[in-house]
Amino acid sequence: MRILELELQHFRNYSGQRVSFDPDCNVIFGENAQGKTNLLEAIVYLSCGKSPRARTDREMIAFDAPAAVLEAGISARDREFRTRVELYRDRRRKMWVNQVPAKNSAALSQVYHTVFFCPDDLYLIREGAAARRRFMDTALCQLRPRYAAALAEYHRLYDHKTRILRDSEERPDLLELLPDFNERMVRFGAVLVHYRRQFAEALNRYAARHHRECSGGRERLEITYQTVSSVTDPAAEGEVLTEQLRAHMESHQGAERASRMCLSGPHKDDLVITIDGREAKSYSSQGQTRTAALALKLAEREIYQNATGEYPVLLLDDVLSELDPRRQEFVLNRIAGGQVFITCCEDDRLPVLLGGKVFHVKQGAIG
């Protein structure tokens, strides 16, 4: 999977820019706040219809513009594709794949995949469960269209149920709607558990190897998927998962109505990460957490490659500058085989070390 060219109009600080990329290594350097991360953000957005940092599409439209356009030429699966997204301030976005209108972002995810790694990801191990769920969701939504659809529906049901519980004090009759919402949530929740368990097992397999190699064989990383307590075996058949999720939700009905909050379901899932048997979130050093985060991201890349037969586009946003020389070398020795984009600062030696095509970004212009 490779990005051949990218065109941006009124996206962030890019008023109008067209650029062609190297099929292997692209190094983007420049001072801070010039547009390096914005460029990577556009590549990620065109792969999945979601920004790794913006909460709304409007945030990505240039301040003085009514709309923004992102368009890319892509090579994947021995074919060439053209994807286009138009973002608007006052209406829904529009998307196309090869000039055919796309109903939703799932159409973008079927063209190419990205693995985005930024400095915040180095703290993935120590953050709360929401960060690790987001990590799973981002990967699985690109890989599995059924997962993306189930997640969107689960979130919709969760939001509705939350409003019902919140408003039930003034309108107790709303509680009559809960059984239907609960039943649909457990059915879509079972789909989430099924795919998350598969992803966590693959992640554990690959990340453990990367972590062992980076630590010189001194440490053992283990990743375990954690869902609601009533699910005794996340690998069970769908109907079994549904029944166990249903039992958990029924046992929490009283507490949910009392607290007016959704307390049961896979929206509380987590990845439990241990190093030598000790939970990394609480006991690992800064160096250990960074090594573990690197292992997770490299494992994510391998999962994509095994699922699709091609490496995803790898985007390293100012990550290498945050690492010591040993970890820098470890990453650079493991990114061959696919297209990579690496951002760095003006005074960084990475452009000289990496080769490939070098781009200088200044005030939203790429030279």
Predicted feature residues:
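Conserved NTPase motor "head" modules and their coupling/switch loops across ABC/AAA+ ATPases, GTPases
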Residues: 1-31, 172-313, 322-326, 330-333, ...
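Long, charged N-terminal accessory/stalk domains
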Residues: 123-124, 130-179, 183-186
